[in-house]
């Protein structure tokens, strides 16, 4: 019986873009930047996928919620009835 060996794939660790570039700021009024961190279904992308650090993920979550509150970002996608 042949033994199958799995090759380990190397996954590059994602780096927080807000820590790397101090010019970038998280602002609830900047919906263009916030859309990158929201799925097409309207959910906030988790840290392990987006690569943000804990501090900036908390700020980002707060900014997305504020943008939703004043209708800069939708809560969900458009539903076809």
From Swiss-Prot:
BP-aspect Gene Ontology terms: translation
Protein's UniProt keywords contain Ribonucleoprotein: yes
Transmembrane segments: none
Pfam annotation, one family: Ribosomal_S18
Protein's UniProt keywords contain Kinase: no
Keywords: Ribonucleoprotein, Ribosomal protein, RNA-binding, rRNA-binding
GO cellular component: cytosolic small ribosomal subunit
GO-annotated molecular function: small ribosomal subunit rRNA binding; structural constituent of ribosome
Function: Binds as a heterodimer with protein bS6 to the central domain of the 16S rRNA, where it helps stabilize the platform of the 30S subunit.
Subunit structure: Part of the 30S ribosomal subunit. Forms a tight heterodimer with protein bS6.
Family: Belongs to the bacterial ribosomal protein bS18 family.
Official protein name in the record: Small ribosomal subunit protein bS18
Organism: Syntrophobacter fumaroxidans (strain DSM 10017 / MPOB)
Annotated gene: rpsR
